[in-house]
């Protein structure tokens, strides 16, 4: 059983907590980054384009472990920016991907830098493997 918990103020498109029954198979995914198949940064200087690539890569990670966006329980979304408008633009990409339709809880963070030169977005995820 997986359920969405929304006991606090109404969350925009995520849950305040996710509950998973013991014995459920989980996948803990490393950060999805905006690299193409050749290992090059996609959308240099463009956090929205990078978020799109990150979501595409996240879907591939999920597929590889036998899961999908509907089974994501938790994400942490890292954006190299101190501007809430930039964080919101990246979050809109996350919402548009369909990720927010599941029981997932999320944290959206503005950070100083990420691991690759030119990288502006990274998303880590935990998902149920049905």
Model-inferred region functions:
Residues 1-130:
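Short, polar/acidic, helix-capping and beta-turn segments at strand->helix junctions
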């Amino acid at each position: 059983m997986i359920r969405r918990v929304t006991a606090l103020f109404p969350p925009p498109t995520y849950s305040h907590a996710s509950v998973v029954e013991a014995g459920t198979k989980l996948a803990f995914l490393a950060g999805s980054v905006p690299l193409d198949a050749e290992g090059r940064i996609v959308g240099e200087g463009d956090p929205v384009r990078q978020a799109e690539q990150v979501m595409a890569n996240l879907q591939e990670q999920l597929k590889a472990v036998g899961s999908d966006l509907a089974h994501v329980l938790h994400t942490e979304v890292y954006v190299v920016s101190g501007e809430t408008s930039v964080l919101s633009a990246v979050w809109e990409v996350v919402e548009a991907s369909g990720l927010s339709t599941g029981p997932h809880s999320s944290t959206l963070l503005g950070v100083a830098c990420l691991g690759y030169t030119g990288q502006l977005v990274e998303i880590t995820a935990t998902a149920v493997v049905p």
